[in-house]
């Protein structure tokens, strides 16, 4: 379900970057400014707002090709952006995550080999000495299982994304659920180039508390727990 378009610059190249946001006024401008070189190359940046109350859409508008509104929920927001994307490849980027230099070239090279989808390695911004360890484990686990997380900037051929029905509309683990379906089509391209994602989740809740929580939620999900129940525990 597409929302309201507030900017209509036709800059779609072969890559469409979809950024779901909710109350990201503090960082959205810097995040989108980092994507300016990609826009200059003709790639498309689509911001999808889930009902921000802090002026995020207005701040984003000068730095995006489209700013859309959607019902709240990351999966819904990403599906909304994908519906209006003009690129051959979709890249889903969290608002607190930065792409590495050469990201588009890395994705292009992966897709040129016939890869249908993939993700980047991740590193975590912050002072904790545990962050490199956590990131290394996330990257290793993803290579081992073929499951990607949203922090790793998932990319997928647009036609395949639509053929599979997009993200399942669920409040948590939507990235895991999509990965499960995508890996039935092909193994992911696990790019060694690293995105930089915020460590604020770990810093706010505590590193070990967050690790244990995420392990518990993931284990429960694999055992069939409802995403709605898990989302309440995550909050």
Task: Mark where each language-model region is.
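A conserved acidic beta->alpha catalytic loop
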Residues: 49-57, 97
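Acidic helix N-cap motif at the loop->helix transition within catalytic regions
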Residues: 26-30, 54-63, 102
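Short, acidic, metal-binding catalytic loop of nucleotide-sugar glycosyltransferases
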Residues: 33-42
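Short aromatic/hydrophobic "clamp" motif used to bind/position activated sugar donors
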Residues: 90
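Cell-envelope/extracellular polymer assembly enzymes that use nucleotide-activated donors
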Residues: 14-16, 44, 177
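Hydrophobic helical membrane-anchoring modules
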Residues: 1-10, 180-235
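Conserved donor nucleotide-binding strand/loop of the catalytic core
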Residues: 43-46, 57-84
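Conserved donor NDP-sugar-binding/catalytic core segment of glycosyltransferases
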Residues: 101-130
């Amino acid at each position: 379900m597409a929302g309201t378009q507030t900017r209509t610059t036709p800059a779609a190249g072969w890559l469409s970057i979809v950024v779901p946001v909710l109350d990201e006024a503090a960082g959205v401008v810097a995040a989108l400014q980092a994507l300016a070189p990609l826009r200059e190359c003709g790639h498309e940046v689509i911001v999808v707002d889930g009902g921000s109350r802090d002026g995020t859409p207005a701040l984003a508008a000068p730095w995006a090709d489209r700013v859309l509104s959607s019902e709240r929920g990351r999966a819904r927001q990403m599906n909304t952006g994908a519906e209006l994307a003009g690129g051959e490849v979709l890249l889903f980027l969290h608002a607190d995550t930065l792409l590495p230099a050469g990201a588009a070239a890395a994705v292009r090279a992966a897709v040129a080999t016939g890869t249908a989808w993939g993700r980047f390695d991740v590193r975590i911004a912050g002072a904790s000495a545990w962050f490199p360890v956590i990131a290394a484990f996330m990257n290793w686990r993803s290579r081992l299982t073929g499951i990607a997380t949203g922090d790793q900037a998932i990319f997928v051929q647009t036609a395949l994304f639509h053929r599979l029905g997009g993200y399942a509309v669920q409040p948590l683990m939507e990235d895991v659920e999509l990965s499960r379906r995508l890996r039935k089509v092909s193994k992911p391209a696990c790019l060694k180039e690293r995105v930089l994602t915020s460590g604020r989740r770990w810093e706010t809740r505590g590193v070990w508390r967050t690790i244990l929580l995420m392990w518990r939620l993931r284990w429960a999900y694999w055992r069939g727990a409802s995403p709605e129940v898990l989302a309440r525990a995550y909050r």
